[in-house]
A protein has these predicted regions:
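A short helix-loop-beta-strand connector motif used in the catalytic cores of GNAT acetyltransferases and
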Residues: 43-55
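Conserved beta-strand-loop-alpha-helix junction that forms the acyl-donor binding cleft
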Residues: 116-127
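A conserved beta-turn-beta hairpin within the catalytic core of GNAT-like acetyltransferases
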Residues: 72-83
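Conserved acetyl-CoA-binding loop-helix of GNAT-fold acetyltransferases
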Residues: 93-106
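A short, internal acetyl-CoA/4′-phosphopantetheine-binding micro-motif in the GNAT/acyltransferase core
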Residues: 84-94
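Conserved catalytic-core motifs of GNAT/GCN5-like acyltransferases
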Residues: 119-120, 136-146
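Short amphipathic alpha-helix that is part of the acyltransferase structural core
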Residues: 1-36
Length: 146
C-alpha cells in the first residue's frame, strides 16, 4: 500500500505516534540520556491552532510526523510556520520523505502561511533535501546549554 499524508490533531493522535516520538528522541538525544517531551503543552498548542501536525501512514501505522508552530512575524505581522519536530522512519526516508515535506508545505501555504522555517543539524540529509526543495540558509542558530 502507498503511504498517505494527513493533517491530524496531535491531541487526539499522540497515542498512535508515541513509538515514533521515542525513536526520534533516541536519535536526537542519544541512548541513555533523558528525554521528556511536554505532551500536555503540545496537545494544548494543537487544540488552540498554534501547532499544526501532519503524519505519514502506511497500512494504518504512523511512520512519520511533522509539527509546525504558527506565529506572526515580529516585523511584518505575516504568518510563519517554524518546524519544531520532523521524524520519518528510516525505511521511509528518501522519496516518501521529500513528498511529505512538499505536502506539509502545500498545506501550510493553503492556510495563509508566508514563510516556513526549518532548524536542522548541519550536514544532515534534511539540509540537502531542503536545499533541493528551494529553501535557503538565512540564519545560523547559536545556543548555550546550562
Amino acid at each position: 500500500m502507498k503511504p498517505i499524508f494527513r493533517e491530524v490533531n496531535l491531541a487526539h493522535h499522540i497515542g498512535r505516534a508515541i513509538h515514533l516520538i521515542d525513536a526520534h528522541c533516541q536519535e536526537v538525544v542519544g541512548q541513555g540520556k533523558k528525554y521528556n517531551p511536554d505532551i500536555d503543552y503540545l496537545c494544548m498548542g494543537s487544540n488552540t491552532g498554534l501547532l499544526h501536525t501532519f503524519d505519514i501512514e502506511d497500512n494504518d501505522k504512523v511512520v512519520g510526523y511533522a509539527v509546525f508552530m504558527i506565529a506572526k512575524d515580529f516585523i511584518t505581522s505575516e504568518r510563519s510556520a517554524s518546524n519544531v519536530a520532523m521524524y520519518v522512519s528510516p525505511e521511509y526516508r528518501g522519496r516518501t520523505a521529500v513528498r511529505f515535506m512538499q505536502y506539509t508545505e502545500m498545506m501550510l501555504l493553503s492556510k495563509g502561511i508566508k514563510q516556513i522555517n526549518f532548524h536542522v543539524p548541519p550536514s544532515s540529509m534534511a539540509e540537502k533535501c531542503l536545499a533541493h526543495l528551494g529553501y535557503n540558509l538565512r540564519e545560523k542558530v547559536y545556543y548555550k546549554e546550562f
